[in-house]
Every structure is written in C-alpha cells, then in structure tokens.
Amino acid sequence: MSLVNFYGQLSNTQQFDQIRINIASPDQVRSWSFGEVTKPETINYRTFKPEKDGLFCARIFGPVKDYECLCGKYKRMKNRGIICEKCGVEVTVSRVRRERMGHIELAAPIAHIWFLKSLPSRISTLLDMTMRDLEKILYFENYVVLDPGLSILQKGELLTEEELQKAKDKYGEDAFTASIGAEVIQQMLKDLDFAKLKQELYEELQNTTSEVKKKKLVKRLKLVEDFLESENKPEWMIIDVLPVIPPEIRPLVMLDGGRFATSDLNELYRRVINRNNRLKKLIESKAPDIIVRNEKRMLQEAVDALFDNGRRGRAAKNANKRPFKSLSDMLKGKQGRFRQNLLGKRVDYSGRSVIVVGPELKLHQCGLPKKMALELFKPFIYSKLELYGIATTIKAAKRMVEAEKPEVWDVLEEVIREHPVLLNRAPTLHRLGIQAFEPLLIEGKAIQLHPLVCAAFNADFDGDQMAVHIPLSIEAQLEARVFMMSTNNILSPANGRPIIVPDKDIVLGLYYLTIAFDNEVGEGLMFSDLAEMEHALYNKFITIHTKIKYRRNQLNAEGKMVPVIVDTTYGRLMVGELLPSNPNIEFKFINKQLTKKDISLVIDLVYRHCGQKATVIFADQLMKLGFKYACSSGISFGMDDMVVPESKSTHINETQLEIKEFEQQYSNGLITYGEKYNKVVDAWSRCTDRVANDMMKEIATPPINDEPNHQKINAIYMMAVSGARGSFQQIKQLGGMRGLMTKSNGQIIQTPIISNFKEGLTEFECFNSANGMRKGQIDTALKTASSGYLTRKLVDVAQDCIITEKDCGTDKGIEVKSVIEGGEVIVSLAEKILGRTAAIDIFHPVTNDLILNKGELINEVKLEQIESAGLDRIMIKSVLTCESTTGICSICYGRDLATGTLVSEGEAIGVIAAQSIGEPGTQLTMRTFHIGGAATKGAEISSVEASYDAKVKIISRNVVINSEERKIVMSRNCELLLLDNNGNEKARHKIPYGARLLVDDGDMVIKTQKLAEWDPYTIPIITEKSGKVLFKDMVEGISIRDVTDEATGIPSKVIIESKQYSRGAELRPRIQLLDAKGEVITLSNGLEARYYLPVGAVLSVEDGVQISVGDIIARIPKESTTTKDITGGLPRVAELVEARRPKDHAVIAEVDGRVEFGKDYKSKRRIIIHPIDETMSIEYMVPKGKHVVVNEGDFVKKGDLLIDGNPVLQDILKVMGVEVLANYIVKEVQAVYRLQGVKIDDKHIEVIIRQMLQKVEITDSGGTTLLVGEKVDRHEFDEINEKAIKNGLKPAEAQLILQGITKASLQTRSFISAASFQETTRVLTEAAIAGKVDKLRGLKENVIVGRLVPAGTGYFMDKMRKAAVKLDEENSINADKG
C-alpha cells in the first residue's frame, strides 16, 4: 500500500501544487467551449425553457433538470451520456451548467480593455505609442501607417481621413499601407519580433543617459521579457473569440408574480451578441465603410462594458440608471468573488444569540440554550437515536426531534458531553476572538459566557451577540480542544501577559476584601487556625478588615513546610488559601490591598511556576470570591462621594491672575499670540491637575466618623484605585474641574470648563463640552474603519510569515538596550529581551562566567542573572536578521508569547503579529469617547530635574556665560548624564540649544534638584560673542515685515518669504556682529559671526544696538500644541508601516562633516556638508521656511538632523542601515501604544518590518539578465546570483529598499493573495502577461483554493504528505530495480 493513500484520497484541491495564470489564446477559448452562442435570447417566455443557441441554451450548457433532456424524450439515470437526437441535449447532471462554457465568434477583433486601459497600458507600452493614439486607432478616429512604402510617411504615423485622402492623391493608392481599427493593432502586435526588440532595447538602454528615457526603456524591456518567458503571444491581447461563462454563474431567476431577475452579465452579453450579429449582417451585405465602422466601434464598447464597465467612457446603465456589474466588478472589492465568497464564507452548523453573564460556569464552559443545541447537533442526535434503536429510520428520528420528545433531550445531553463548541464575537480582531468551550445546556434563549474571557472577546453584556460554531469531524474537535479551549489561552499572544484577569466587580470585591482598617474590632489578636478565625468572625470578635497576626505554613525552597507569622487580615487569608503552594509564590504577593495590577501579577506568577491547570483553578476561585464580596460589600456611590476640594477656588483665582499677566505681556508685545496661547493652555492644564490632586487627596482620606455604619473608604476612590472602573481622568471631571476641551480639529479651546459634573455646567460650558463630546463620537465612528483597514493591510503583508525551521544558523543579530526618555527608564532591558535568544555567547563582565550560550532562550531565570551582572545592552537574534529562505526560524523568533515556550514549527507568526498591532488600534479608537472630549495634554516640558542623587556628566558641553551670569547651552547635541557611585549611567537627558544650565560637569546633585530650564515654545538664536548688530538683506516689505498684532497694536519684525518679488529672490536675511572697528567678528570656529534667519523668525533686537554674549537675537515660535491621543497615534502608525514621507520631514546628514551654507536657489536654501575624509561634499536643498537646526561651521555626525521633524524612513535605511531603521520604527510605534498603556512585544513589529524589507533594487546587473533599477525579491536575487556565479558570470549588485505594507502586499510572490487584497484587475493583468506561477505558500491563497492552510496542523500534514510522496517514489524505484 502506498503511503500517500494513508492520508485518504486527495481532494480536487490537493491534486495540484501550484496555479499558473496566462492570457487565453483564441484556440484555447474554443477548446473550452461546448458550442457557439449566436442568439441573444435567454428563455422562452411561454414555456420557460432555454432558447436554442441562446445564452441559456441546453444543447451548449447542459440539461436544466438532472438526467433529463429538454424535450423529455430521455429521462432517468439509465440514459446517462446519451445525446438526444431531437433537442441535441446530453443527458447528464444539471450541475454541468455551472462548468460548461460557450463562446461567441466576433465578427471583428476587439482590444481587451484590461491590457488597453489598465495603467500602465500594456499594448501602448509594447507598441511604444501613447494611449490617446491607440484609442484613436481602436475607436476609428485615425488611420495608422503600417508600411510607408514609397511615400515619405513614417511607420506608425497617424493620419486623419482627410490626410489619408491627400496622401493617396499625392503618392497613389498602392504606394503605402494604412489601416484602422483593432485589426491593425493586432497586425502590429503580430509583427513584433521579441528577440530582436529585446536586443535593440538593451542596446538603447546602455547608450542613453536620460533618466526618464531609461525608466521608459526598462518598463518596455521588462514587458518584452515577460512575454518571452511566459510564451504568451502579444496578439492574444486582441480578442477574436469571446468566452461565455456558464449560465448558472449568471442566473436568471423567476420572482413571485411572473417577473424575472437576471444577472447584469446576461444583459451585457446580449448587447455584445446583438451588435455582433448586426455587424455580421452589415459585412455580408457590403454596407458602406462608415456604417460598418460605427458598428465595430459599438461592438468594442459592448465588450469593454462586459469586461470592465465604466473603465472607458460612460458606464452602461440599466433602466434604473444603475451601472451594470461587469466581470471585473464580480472580482473586485469587499463584495467581489475573492473577499465575499472565497475568503469569507457563511458556514453551516452555526447560530447566534445574545450573551449573558454566567458567573457559576467553570472557565472551560459556556451555557448553550437547549433550543439552539437541539438545532445545531441535529445530525448527531439522529445517528444516536438510530444507534440506540429509539428511532427506526432517520425520518422517524427527524419527527421525534421536531416533536421534542423527552428521550431526545437525554440523547442531546449525551451528544454534547465533551463535544466542544466554538464561540466567536465580531469583530474578531485577534485570535482570541474565537475560543472553544464545553457547552452546558441551559433554559432560556441567551448564551451564557464566563466573565473571565470577556477581556479576550472584548465582550460586555449590554446586548452583545455571539456566534456558535460546531466542529464536526473528530480532528476538528481535537484541534478545538487542544488549541482553542479557553483554558489553553491564558496568555495574550501580543505581550505574553495573562489575559484571563479579573476585572470590574471581581477586582472591586477583592480590593474590598483585602483592605485593612485601623482601630477595627479585635485588632492585634493572634490565630493559628482558619476555622478558629471563622468562629471569631461569626461571633463578631473580628471583621474581615481587622489587622491580626496569623501563623501560616509556607513551602520553602527545599520543599518543606515552615511556619511563619504574618501580619494580615482575615480577608487576605481567604485569598491566600486559594494560592497553590509553591516556594516562589509567597504570601507577601497578596498580603496587601489587591489592585487589578497586583492580581494580574499573581496570576502570571502562578502560571509561570505552577502551570496551566493550577492557574485556571486559581483564576476561577478568585472570580467566585471577588463576586461574593463585591455583592456583600454593598459598594455603590452617591452624590456625596464626589468631593469638590476647598482649594479649588484658590487654584482657579491664581491661574486667572497668571493668565492676566500673559495677556499683559502679549499686549506689551513681549510674546506672540502663539506663545500666549501655549502658555494659557499650559497654565490651565496645571491648574486642572492641581485641583484634581487635591480632590484625590480628600477622597483618599475620608472624614473621621465614629458611627458604626459609617463607610470608612470612599467608593469612587475605591473603584478608581483598584482599577475596577473609572479613571483618574473621569473622577477629575466629577469632583474637580472638567478642564480644557478639544475642538473637533484637535486644537485646545483656551477657556476651560471650570465647573465639574457635581456642581453642574453653565450654558456656555455646556456648549463647549458638547464640542468635545462630539469629537469623541466622530473619532470613534471614523477611526474604527481606518483602524480595521490598517489591521487588514498588516494581515495581508504578513500572512505568509510562518515558522518553517528550527534554526537558520545565522550569526547575525541586533543590539538592544533599555528605552530612556526624559531621563527615565521607560522600558527596561529585561522587558525587551525576555523570550528572545542570544545572538552571541554572553559572559559576566566581572567574573567572566558564561551566562548564556549563543542561540539559548532568555527565560526568567537567565534574566535575573543578566540583571545582576549589570549588563546594559545585549545582542539578540531577531526575525530581521533571520536567513531562512521561506518563512522564519524558531531560534530567531524566540518564545511563543501565548505559551511561554520556544515557538513551534508551523506557527503563523505573521498573522499573530498583524493582529497584535491592529487589535489595540481598534480598541483605542473606541476609548476616546468615554472621556467625553476632555483634553489630555501634559504641560510642555520646560526643565529637567534630577531623579536620583548622582554625579553630573555633560556630553558635548559648549556653554557661554551671558550678561546675567547664567550658563547658556550653545551645543545642538548636549546631553546631561546622571551617574551613580560606580560610574554607571542612571539617567540621560537631552538639553536643548539655548537652555540655561544650572549645574556643571562633575557636580554632585540631590534628588529633585533642577538641572536646566528653557522656554518650551520658542527656539532661540543666541550670540556667542558680544558686538554691534548689523541687519543684512532685511528689506522692509520684501524680506521683513512689521507685523502689528490686531489685539495689542504692538509691532514686531518678522522674516517673510521673499520669493514673490523679483528683486527679493537673492535676499538672505541675516544678522552680522561687528566689532568696535566695524568689521565682522570671527567666531571660535574660524567663521564670521553671521546668523541666518528662517521665515517666521521674530527679531528681538534692533539694527545697530550693542549686545552681549548669550543674548537672544531672534526667536522662532514653535507650532501650538494639539492633544496627544491615539488619533494622533493611529495615523502615525499607519504612516510608519506605509513608509510614507512625513509632512514636514527632517533632513539627515549622510556623512560626518562640517556644515556650510551655500548660495540660495530660488525658494530653497543650500546646505553643504564637507566630509572629514575630504571626499565629494554633499548638497541639500531645503525650503527657506524650514528651521535649520545647525549653524555654519557646526560639526555633524552621520544621521544627525539638519532640519527639525520626523526623518524619512528611506533616508534612515540608506544612511544608517537596517538595524537603526528597525530600532526607529519599533521605538516610534511603541511610543504611540505606550501613551495609551498598551503593551505589544517588539518582535511583532519586527515581523512587519521584515516584510517591508523584502525587495532589493538592482544597482549593477553584472552578468545577469536583471535590469538596473528593477526591483526583485531578496531571495530571488540571491538565487539568480548563485546561478550567475556557477556559470562563471559576474553577480549583480543591489541595495535593500523599504516598501510600505500596501505596496509590499501587492508585490508579494503570490498573485492570488495580491489580487484578493487590492487593485484586483491590475494584479491579474500583470500576472497573466508574465505567466506567473503561484506556489500556494501563504495562508490566503490556500484558503482561496479551498485547502487547509499551511500553518499549524496543516503545515505538518503538508510536510508528512510530501515525505510520503518522496518515500513512495523511492520504494517504487527500489521495487523496479528489484
């Protein structure tokens, strides 16, 4: 027996390994066809039978009824295969009407619109004509010269009717040949000699220098090569024979009342047939040319409409003025074939209902309504009833089930025992949106859901619905139990933290239970036994909050029980009782007021040390305990729980005074409107925070009251602090002040809402707040769609990323260190490396002991060793450096976050990465509207304080002492480090240019000491020498203007764009410093003291005044701040993964060198960098309005910013390489999510970046057939080079390019996957010309062709089947030999 048969018979979808797409030749179309359709009729209106030779003809497409010919002469199975001599119909199954095709012989050739109009037009590229010219020929406007003969006309020249007539008169009728219509295009395509054309183009490419021409030639050459390789003939792009798709795919159905509904395709086909028949008649009757041509043009338009309606000219519309759905529309978009029917199918054995909470369920259970279960498990019930002899036949069983006989329920109980069902809540944003549960039969009509899985499903019980699906086969049930059971999905695949964490009421209950109150009855009593305590509690000697001492047995490291005395409360001991005994899980972890965070940590600990089963039991018991005490505590809140702090009015008055001062400064012209706005907004932000802090303090310490029933702790405070419900933000609005509101465009309104919800809002405040609330609502509506789209794009780009091997054997890796921002460690090294593998052997820096072997997984134990060794950076393996040719290897990926072990082969990590990044995006958009538009913007940072007692070290210290004896920072990249006693870096702060430095290098500072301060709203321009000011190129009204503020009437001088004036073109406004002799001062770097002023700079000095060192001569105002929320964030993530150029992007230095300003060009400034190694200097042209962050003579390092802004990703890749680029993208994406408190593992982002870096651009073709500028897949490039080296040729050279995810998805190796993503027609056109082969490696293409996906179980089945085939072949060879 062959091994392959062991896997059962291969289904149709498994009998092929790859799919190829080509252009169909006329002969192929005829070979598919079962007959020609010559009549436009569909069915006979009296008999309702298909018309002969019409669009539904039974002779061509097959019988309408199974095994019955049209006239009824032959019926039943016995006659199968007979062709009726009367009506000509073959007696067979009617299903063939879905498979058999027909054809239409066109009376004139027609250009296929996809090859003509789908940009770039393939026909026009091949013939080297413009699209307009082509259309003129095809639609019978102009003639084209095919052979100039004896005339002086050019080949391919276009002639109008008159010009043709003139030429004929001039040269004679037969002197040249010119023709019109699709026939001539077909002839021209036929005449192309590709081998010769390729040679000519190649030579031309070598000789040309024009970039535009090169691009055009490369395009044409690529197309020629595609045709040569795919063996497609170019004349097939012009159609002679039109295929007619099977009738069942374009059905005609009868509605009630005798009317018919038909597919649009039938109407489009009818038009084609009508026009074709008319054209045939006209040609036969030798009608005048002009009429025939008009008919040909109409036929061309009819075929265009059939293939792609609306692509050219006006779309063909039906009686209701709605455009017809053409063949292209059937494939395109969400409702098209790919996405509607192939990627998303509706399934049988499923149902949906509303969900309700099921607190008494176990974690692996769900409650399924009896009615639903009866319907869903019908086939199982039928077979059981028959098996037990309760019903004699299936029909009898069916009747019993419909009557709902008592024995049916007993059988149902048995059928569903241990038969898992899948529950799914839409939208399924990550894989935890579908989980398996064992059903329990319940009365009622709602599905009961376990409270702990709500977080994973993102479900609540306000009317949410869920769908139930039944896994039918034993394999499906097995997979559901092993992979999808809720108890097997405790950790989140996005960050490896537990996702089964108590929430809301449970947290509140546990928090209440673990509170310890002072002066409670029975304080200080000692107990050694829980039963004794229970007795005391029952008799009211103690309460659950009384502080007591208790002797508790604890497991030590040797595994022995040791008694310890702990200070605790009865409530905490109840939680302690649930803890599994393990030496690593100490009582101290729960001997405190438990907040949501603490509970999460405890669950994580239990999972890491005691395994999954213990965790599930622990979580379930915690939940029951939490619910019990949330109920018995009776916590709720009323009006009095919202406390308005007494200090509120004081804070508000102070702030109003502060703002009056700003107004005054603004009126005096000391600050600009933008600065005033920023200062006002900041002042109110601070005020709101102060009021809120005072309120929180008051809530946290309720008034002392000796009444017995007095509530000892504020309910609102309890809810917020425990993490059960509500946030600091919301409570601030209830009892503090609502604060600043945002406008719909993200701008902050200057006047805050001083009232809170307890006091009530004034009419004006109400209006203002409606503005903000509306913003929240709109955000939710709009952003959810764009977030879903982002997820879809991510899934598409990463879907074929699968773990395919254990180790790729690479030595490469990336270096990681902790993320420090504003002097604080935001993400520790430990967080970044946990679950990754070491790229090199790692040794202890002091003892030199080996901590980690290369390729070893960094787990919690190893992490402690690394931390104690004090390592601050580590080389780890990454998917970015993985060298597997298909997919990724386990070692480079590291730990599978959902299981905590090394990732196994076949895991679809690409999809998991996409879901992990996309899912929080959707959640965050929905979060905004809960705050109701209150602005969440921290005050701008304007100083740094020491976060530790430490020693100061200043890097690139360049300071001047100004007239007020203050140290002013003049360096652009000054950094201040805080070092501990051993000289290790504890914090790092960037000190901006123009800041006042309050400490010096080597100083010792204490915690909270101020180190430096600066104005956060302006960028100053500061002098480093004293001297006399001289204005240069400042012409009033051309390069500088007195701007008088409307509100204050104070004028200030502002630099303006000078390009609108002819004489202003060369102006470069600048300030020079003169010494006493009137000569320009020379600075320390040897250059003259010249300060160029960008557009928008506000002057702080007058011409001719004397200034001293460190004075500000001009200020550049910064843009006003808008709120930071995920709205700013999601588009930022999209911008990064789409690799778009940011709006005001930065310019980065490509080399180390000195800066010089060159001669300006029109509206651009010229920045020149002279490299240290004295190679060619590099020029940058930047718009004049942009703020240049370097000065003339500054020394810049490779990668430094020359202009403020976000750098362009492609520049980072080019200048700094892959690792720096990856670090930058990871850092930026993480910053967006971190702002919202979402944790995503770095490796997910790295997977996406890997997919963005799939292609290389050829810089030198060497001895290969690749073209310079062509973009090819990295692995293909390596394969081509290997071949070249084998054949003794020079390998090609290329550089890595970064593609956005949409582009990367569309250029994936699989055309099926790309076509189902976007731009379906373009992808299919390209693929058909190149004769592309889809190897069916990714997930999408396999789903589309109806196979198991090559991931998980499918991956191994595939692997084993391939091995079986190989062994079978070997066995058969051996047998033959034998």
Swiss-Prot record:
GO cellular component, one term: DNA-directed RNA polymerase complex
EC number of the protein: 2.7.7.6
Subunit structure: The RNAP catalytic core consists of 2 alpha, 1 beta, 1 beta' and 1 omega subunit. When a sigma factor is associated with the core the holoenzyme is formed, which can initiate transcription.
Protein name: DNA-directed RNA polymerase subunit beta'
Cofactor needs: Mg(2+); Zn(2+)
Family matches, as HAMAP family: RNApol_bact_RpoC
Coiled coil: none
Gene expressing this chain: rpoC
Residues where Mg(2+) binds: D460, D462, D464
Binding, Zn(2+) 1: C69, C71, C84, C87
Positions bound to Zn(2+) 2: C808, C882, C889, C892
